[in-house]
Amino acid sequence: MRAARTVEPSGPEGLRIEDVAAPAPGPDEIRVKVKATALNRADLLQTMGLYPAPPGAPPDIPGLEYAGEVAQVGANVTRWRVGDRVMGLVAGGAWAEELITHEREAIAIPFGLSFSEAA
């Protein structure tokens, strides 16, 4: 998959679009195909190395808000199915084609809302 990676903590100019390994969900997690994301102050601070990702979050892929479709579910997931439209907030990694989040951290996108509006 492709992701915007911080290769040099210098702001947006330190980002590169690169191929990275696709994440695999744990038993209580879902893999989301990201359809839209957002840009906020915390994202910019991450690209400058001033807002480090917490443990467990991708340290080099910024992005906090996302909207997309469930692409895979972990073995214990009961809340979501492949194809469900979800949105949410992650600790990092939303500037990628796919991300992993705990099933409890995703929210159903309300009917009539686009992916861009949801992100």
Located regions from the model:
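Short, acidic Gly/Pro/Ser/Thr-rich loop/turn segments
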Residues: 12, 39-41
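Cytochrome P450 core scaffold surrounding the K-helix E-X-X-R motif
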Residues: 41-48
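General structural signal for secondary-structure boundaries
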Residues: 11, 21, 111-114
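NAD(P)H dinucleotide-binding glycine-rich loop of Rossmann-like/cofactor-binding domains
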Residues: 45, 72, 79, 85-119
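Extracellular beta-rich ligand/substrate-recognition surface
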Residues: 6-14
